[in-house]
């Protein structure tokens, strides 16, 4: 496959044009008065959104050189979204400004390597300053303000604060589509999984068609149980110990005589047991069973660890305060597992989340984490049309991510003002000289861009606003929604510091790489082959 090359200034200018095309598309959405972007979809209705990363993912530029620049900025938005879940538009605007300012200096003869050093030092100093000025949040009202600002909707803010309050900061909040118009909150306490009873005869509450077990024993078996001979020794021990105590059996499957024996005993009233299938498949099933075991103080019975069902005693059984089993779901509330073991398991899952590259794996691990940490909240969202529903769901997901980030590292004043104040630490160019000092100055000039575009989108003169904000004290800034200057934290205009910090760090990372680029290599487009049968040889028919 032949390649075509572009060198030096030409190469960098082409990259910059690509960066600008993508950033100009995204930056119309920034701020409370930002606009939306409509994205055509091959199938179904178009998507209307103001989410930077969603827009960035859809942009492909025709010119292959420019497309390289656009793809690099897409990386900024995606990475910021992965780390902080929001702030993707801010990151894109910063990347564009850093590239523009940096390339001016490279064209004027500055050394790209020294510029990069200056930019890196400046970003580190600004990040440190942002973290130092961040205010931790634990008040419900603060959480509501962060979420409301991200989703641009007060009701959403209050709902997310309510959900956070219920599940704690490690709990999972998921967003589902509903058939009604408004927003609803559903809370499931304890560990729930999507498998119900294997036979309707297990039901204890006929009206609600559910089996409720108070203070039960819990048996977790990795394989299938089909022969009653395997189960009988343990059942006898349970009945001897406490005949009135119910038993929940979680296994890959329970069939044949093993199931029928349990059902017969239940109907006769001699013994109350409920059997459910284990959730998930393969390795994920093993991991989920182990989670349940840790939560309830049970031991997973499997051949792998040398445990056989017909040889174990009561010590392998776990307990919980209450278990509710419906046709489709099982919920374990207040498992009797040891606190430190549960914490250890939570830490292990958190480490796995940090190390995974797959979004799907990360989502599944988050779910497991929440189930261990004590609950799941589902926010159900509805809308009049499919297009509006997608847009609302997206805004909700962003707001949840922003709120998590805020709880983790704290908040700074929003509306782009935190960066304007934070770059004041760069005033002496950090004692750098020459091209490194120029690199520091590049960051100083670029950092005002998010505020500038928030103002421009509100129909105002951007640079006038940025210089006014720079003269104010820390925490003060411009509120584009009301058009007033003042204490932004009090006004509820706040950003999670993690979002602002990640946006700047990721933008600088890509921009400084782009400045040090000298050559572009792209594949040559192959000429279209003429369609077969296109040559006429003049045969008369």
Curated annotation (Swiss-Prot):
Q: Name one GO biological process term.
A: protein refolding
Q: Which CDD domains match?
A: GroEL (cd03344)
Which intervals of the chain form a coiled coil?
A: none
Please give the InterPro entries that the UniProt record associates with this protein: Chaperonin_Cpn60_CS, Cpn60/GroEL, Cpn60/GroEL/TCP-1, GroEL-like_apical_dom_sf, GROEL-like_equatorial_sf, TCP-1-like_intermed_sf
- Which reaction is catalysed here? ATP + H2O + a folded polypeptide = ADP + phosphate + an unfolded polypeptide
Could you say which residues bind ATP here? Answer: 29-32, 86-90, 415, 479-481, 495
* Any one GO CC term of the record: GroEL-GroES complex
Q: Which UniProt keywords apply?
A: ATP-binding, Chaperone, Cytoplasm, Isomerase, Nucleotide-binding
Enzyme nomenclature, EC number: 5.6.1.7
What subcellular compartments does it reside in?
Cytoplasm
By sequence similarity, the record places it as follows: Belongs to the chaperonin (HSP60) family.
- How is the quaternary structure described? Forms a cylinder of 14 subunits composed of two heptameric rings stacked back-to-back. Interacts with the co-chaperonin GroES.
Q: This chain belongs to which protein, by name?
A: Chaperonin GroEL 1
């Amino acid at each position: 496959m032949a390649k075509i090359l572009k060198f030096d200034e030409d190469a960098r200018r082409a990259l910059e044009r690509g960066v600008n095309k993508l950033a100009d598309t995204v930056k119309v959405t920034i701020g409370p008065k930002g606009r939306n972007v409509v994205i055509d979809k091959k199938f179904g209705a178009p998507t209307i959104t103001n989410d930077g990363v969603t827009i960035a993912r859809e942009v492909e530029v025709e010119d292959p050189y420019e497309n390289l620049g656009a793809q690099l900025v897409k990386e900024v938005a995606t990475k910021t979204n992965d780390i902080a879940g929001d702030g993707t538009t801010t990151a894109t605007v910063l990347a564009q400004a850093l590239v523009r300012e940096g390339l001016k200096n490279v064209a004027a003869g500055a050394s790209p390597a020294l510029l990069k050093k200056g930019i890196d030092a400046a970003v580190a100093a600004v990040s440190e300053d942002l973290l130092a000025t961040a205010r931790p949040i634990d008040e419900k009202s603060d959480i509501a303000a962060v979420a409301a600002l991200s989703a641009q909707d007060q009701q959403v803010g209050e709902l997310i604060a309510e959900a956070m309050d219920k599940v704690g900061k490690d709990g999972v909040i998921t967003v589902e589509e509903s058939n009604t118009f408004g927003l609803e909150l559903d809370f499931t306490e304890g560990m729930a999984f999507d498998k119900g009873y294997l036979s309707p005869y297990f039901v204890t509450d006929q009206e609600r068609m559910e089996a409720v077990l108070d203070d039960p024993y819990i048996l977790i078996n990795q394989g299938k149980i089909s022969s009653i001979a395997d189960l009988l020794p343990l059942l006898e021990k349970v009945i001897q110990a406490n005949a009135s105590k119910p038993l929940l059996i979680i296994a890959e499957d329970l069939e044949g005589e093993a199931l029928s024996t349990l059902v017969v005993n239940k109907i006769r009233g001699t013994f109350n047991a409920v059997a459910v299938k284990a959730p998930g498949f393969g390795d994920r099933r093993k991991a989920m069973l182990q989670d349940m075991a840790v939560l309830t103080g049970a031991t997973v019975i499997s051949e792998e660890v040398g445990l056989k069902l017909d040889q174990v005693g009561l010590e392998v059984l776990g307990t919980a305060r209450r278990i509710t089993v419906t046709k489709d779901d099982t919920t374990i509330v207040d498992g009797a597992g040891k606190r430190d073991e549960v914490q250890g398991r939570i830490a292990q899952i958190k480490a796995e989340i940090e190390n995974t590259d797959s979004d799907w794996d990360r989502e599944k691990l988050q779910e497991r984490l929440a189930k261990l940490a004590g609950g799941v909240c589902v926010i159900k969202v509805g809308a009049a049309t499919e297009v509006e529903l997608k847009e609302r769901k997206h805004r909700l997901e962003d707001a949840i991510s922003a709120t998590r980030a805020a709880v983790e590292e704290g908040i700074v004043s929003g509306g782009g003002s935190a960066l304007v104040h934070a770059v004041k630490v760069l005033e002496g160019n950090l004692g750098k000289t020459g091209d490194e000092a120029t690199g520091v100055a590049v960051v100083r000039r670029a950092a005002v861009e998010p505020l500038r575009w928030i103002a421009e989108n509100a129909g105002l003169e951007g640079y006038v606003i940025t210089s006014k904000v720079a003269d104010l004290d820390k925490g003060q800034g411009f509120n584009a929604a009301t058009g007033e200057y003042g204490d932004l934290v009090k006004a509820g205009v706040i950003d999670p510091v993690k979002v602002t910090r990640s946006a700047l760090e990721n933008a600088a990372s890509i921009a400084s790489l782009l400045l040090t680029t000298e050559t572009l290599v792209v594949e040559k487009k192959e000429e279209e082959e003429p369609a077969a049968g296109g040559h006429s040889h003049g045969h008369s028919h």
